[in-house]
């Protein structure tokens, strides 16, 4: 396959694009932790900015709920944020100080689930703002990204515990150790094969875990690529950012990893998502990248 790589400039400089997601209407939403705001890129390319009420909130990851609202984590402000469909920003302070919320996703019943890096907890927040937290079994696990699995449980990475965690709606937690020692798992996503896929930022591998907990690992060709985030693409392809190598990686259906260099030097790619046709990724260098299929060599 051949892909066209494009890089889009943002309105302002030194804004720190980090998390990224796409709505079902094709709008691209990004967090900008240095500028303390969230931006939305419309289909016509127009950018709408949403400055956060809390200064220096360090907004990190975001997700779009099934009812079209944008939810996000304010890592330094210790809050969960929300942009309603009318564009109103609401913030919810976590019960415990310095919890450092990070990853975020929607659960099976519409609640929003998130990780607390410093708090060593998994949290959930209801539509009316009620928060409940679940302590992890091991101290200092540093839970990072979180995603909904095909089994309707929430799956998350434990960056410092070298494990993949699973939590049910009732709060039951199971942990699965990663074979590679000190692998530093970060991003995780549900694949189109119904398994969970994750990246190992230190182990330099892509991991796959089944709902039963069976783990397989795939080595990234470029040393010290420092993979950060991962998303499911077309078919059963997986796409991921290589923060250290300045590349975008693709794990194909036959378990081959292909890599696509980013044009600009030191792009620092972080978040990544797929809208059904295009791979979008956020770069700390104040650009948004997109990869579009232009030729399928199988045809």
UniProtKB/Swiss-Prot annotation:
Identify which cofactors the protein needs according to its UniProt entry.
Answer: Mg(2+)
* Superkingdom of origin organism: Bacteria
Per UniProt, substrate binds at 228
Residues annotated as binding Mg(2+) are 268, 284
Q: Which family is annotated?
A: Belongs to the Vgb family.
Q: How does it assemble?
A: Monomer.
The record, for HAMAP family, names: VirginiamycinB_lyase (MF_01282)
Output this protein's name: Virginiamycin B lyase
Q: What species was this sequence derived from?
A: Staphylococcus aureus
Which gene name belongs to this protein? vgb
